[in-house]
Amino acid sequence: MPDYVAYRKSISNELIDLKDRVRNFIGRGHWGEDGRYKEIILKECLQNHLPANIKIGTGFIMGEGNRITKQIDIIIYTDSCPLLFQKGEFIIAPKEAVLGIIEVKTKLTINNLEETIAHSSENGQIVGRTIFNGIFSYEYGMGIHIERSEVLKSVLRRSSGLVNYICLGPDCFIKHWGYDTDHPNRNQYSTINEQI
């Protein structure tokens, strides 16, 4: 019988191993390049698991009324809809082509989590429809207590489900399931947290 949990953990371990390789070479002097490398690692991992007609880029999305998102680390789009601009992996995509967006962080702390969720929510509003809108952080720092963080709960409520997936390090995953049918103003989020 297949062991899907072990399979997913092996992918997680691969990402962890790859993320440290460049840091071990460059040391602490070039964290910006280290962050870009981590985006590349995640892009390649995603591309290896997506169908051939689904592409990955970085750049901007044009929404209704020619509104433009802030810069997006990873844009997942279909090649069946023409892009507005492309140079290498840099794209400007119409909202109709976009299937998902991901903000990539080396490390999230309670201090920058709210800003990151707000940034991703704003980009989701410009896209104007439900898409995969995720935040992927290789690590998360002190102050983020997943199950009891009032700050996290408050920020997620304000995002109104626009951010629907958050990965914090190798051990924590948060998913938005929609709205509570008995309380339409209440978002339903759940966490999978394997941290001991």
Show the residue positions of the predicted features.
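Intrinsically disordered, low-complexity Ser/Thr/Pro/Gly-rich regulatory segments
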Residues: 1-71, 76-196
